[in-house]
Amino acid sequence: MEQLAAALLAWITAHSDLETRSLPLPEIVLMSPQTLTREYYHGAPHLIPTDGVDDRLNALYAAEDGPHGTIYTLAPAHIDGAEDFDDPADNPLFREILLHELVHHAQWQTGQPVGWACQSQGEKDAYHLGGQYLKELRITDPIPNRNFWAHMYSLC
């Protein structure tokens, strides 16, 4: 997973103004949908959906967890299309999810949030870069209206 994260960080540097070459890698924790849901709702367990899974969650970045931040993500086998790959981590949809969280890692590690009105402002770049990554690979984007959602999720 470290090699994949390093390659995706290099892609981020090549396609944005984020300089990632000297950044430490975050810890990457692969999880089941149930475990990721519990991680997300750890401060408010009464809000966990009754079936134990929030289907909207793919991954989370926690800047203050671990020595250099932690990405909690669905294990590759849980991502749509995983069965089409000998190694589910080769699935471009999994890689885009990881790339999205690595954008947040780069934002936090380079101090960008200091100038933001709220943490949500980092979503626009993460969504746009994820869409660009999929487009480069000629993969159908699973998020219809990505630009709309990038805008909505970045509002404070």
Predicted region positions:
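Structural recognition of the beta-strand scaffold that forms the well-ordered cores
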Residues: Y72-T73, H105-Q107, H128
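Short, solvent-exposed mixed-charge patches
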Residues: L155-C156
